[in-house]
Amino acid sequence: MRRITSLVACLGLAATAAVASTTTPAPTAAVEAASAPKAKIGEKAPAFKLKDLNGKEHSLSDFKGKTVVLEWFCPTCPYSGGRGSKSVHNNGSVKELMKNMKGVEDEGEVVYLLIDSSTAKMRVSAEELSKQDAELKKKIGIEAPILIDGDTAIAKAYGAKSTPHMFVIDGEGVLRYHGAFSDRKDSKKNYVLDAVNSIKAGKEVKPNYIRQWGCGVRYQ
């Protein structure tokens, strides 16, 4: 039996040009996501070691041999958080993805991770962000662990630009896909599931990048 663990990453709101920010601007010291270095397809994904809402530490190296899916997440974003029917968590898209991934016959597990890097965006401490995430997790039934990236260092390392911004990493720790959760016009077209299936089949992931959409990300 395979097990799917989940971790969600909430990275603030920097976004594609089509989506406006819905939260208070971050301090002037914050850096816009567009200027950050980016993790590269076909190369090792940046290592991370982050704690979830229960204080448990999770490292990318813990999941060697497993396909890892990262979702950048923000509790106040209408596309990834708890506001409105367009949220991938409110409209059931994430649960549907996780359900479909349970049927992926792979040698290892599929690990779904949520990462929240919204401290600069929301002007809150890591502790306050954890509290808000815990309340929302319970309220809307988020199944995945939420990891707190309090200093936004992991968001910078990955070049996460929006919430949601998805990253799919294979069992060797190589980044195989990043970008949109699904097609903006056809929500049934899920690029993350396509990437996971391709990795399972030993195939090249195509496409390996689709422009992400959602709320924007800001860094400290």
Describe these PLM feature segments.
Residues 1-8:
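Bacterial N-terminal signal peptides that target proteins for export
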Residues 8-17:
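Bacterial N-terminal signal peptides
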Residues 21-47:
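N-proximal helix/coil linker or "cap" segments that precede and/or mark the start of modular domains
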Residues 48-68:
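A short beta-strand-turn-helix
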Residues 61-87, 196:
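Short active-site neighborhood of thiol/selenol oxidoreductases, capturing the structured segment around
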Residues 81-139, 150-157:
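Structural microenvironment flanking redox-active thiols in thiol-disulfide oxidoreductases
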Residues 142-145, 160-167:
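Structural micro-motif
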Residues 168-220:
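Thiol-/selenol-based redox modules, centered on thioredoxin-like
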